[in-house]
Regions:
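A short-motif feature that recognizes glycine-rich, charge-decorated loops
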Residues: 1-190
């Protein structure tokens, strides 16, 4: 088989396997069979991309997991500057390095970008050292606060080809890459 799919159907706890073969001569269908039966049948060819996926295609690619509506503070720290924003009532205030009204749209936009940010690739599942990714001393670290809960993401060096930036969610060991635009706004002084 070209692709093997393991699945469980409904309340049945038994794992089944669907074996997907090559396309038919006309190219409109795919040969298929279940692992426990000799009978070969056809499935529609438009399903081919559904079956032919890599592990990365199926994983949750969010860079951070958080409830956007519960975020009540943001801390941004870089080598150049740092800032803290706190939500009071329905508005955002900069509380560090000085106390001032913050641009609601800019702060909410940042939260939105972090919430919808996606991994481009996995650089290392459990790296021995963060130095080669520039994460031992990150360029920028963002911490989102929701009551007593905190979640942080650090951004390090650019990838060799410049198409991505290494990042790490503090709650997971893996190092992944993200689009550079996700980091650019974070480097601006508050």
């Amino acid at each position: 088989p070209r692709v093997e799919v393991a699945f469980k159907a409904g309340d049945d706890k038994t794992e089944r396997r669907l074996l997907i073969g090559e396309k038919t001569a006309t190219g409109g269908d795919l040969y298929a069979k279940t692992a426990d039966q000799p009978r070969v049948f056809l499935v529609s060819g438009f399903l081919d991309p559904t079956f032919d996926r890599k592990n990365f295609d199926l994983r949750d690619k969010r860079v951070l997991r958080f409830d956007r509506d519960k975020v009540d503070a943001i801390e941004i720290a870089s080598a150049q500057s740092s800032g803290r924003f706190a939500k009071r009532d329905d508005s955002w205030r900069m509380t560090a390095p000085l106390d001032a009204k913050a641009d609601f749209g800019a702060v909410e936009g940042l939260i939105g970008r972090l919430g919808s940010g996606q991994m481009k690739s996995i650089a290392a599942a459990a790296p021995e050292s963060l130095k080669e990714y520039g994460l031992h001393e990150p360029d920028v670290t963002v911490t989102l606060v929701a009551g007593s809960a905190r979640t942080s993401i650090s951004f390090g060096a650019k990838t060799a080809d410049g198409s991505g930036v290494y990042a790490r969610d503090a709650s997971r060991p893996l190092v992944f890459t993200v689009e550079p635009f996700l980091v650019e706004d974070l480097k601006k002084p508050p």
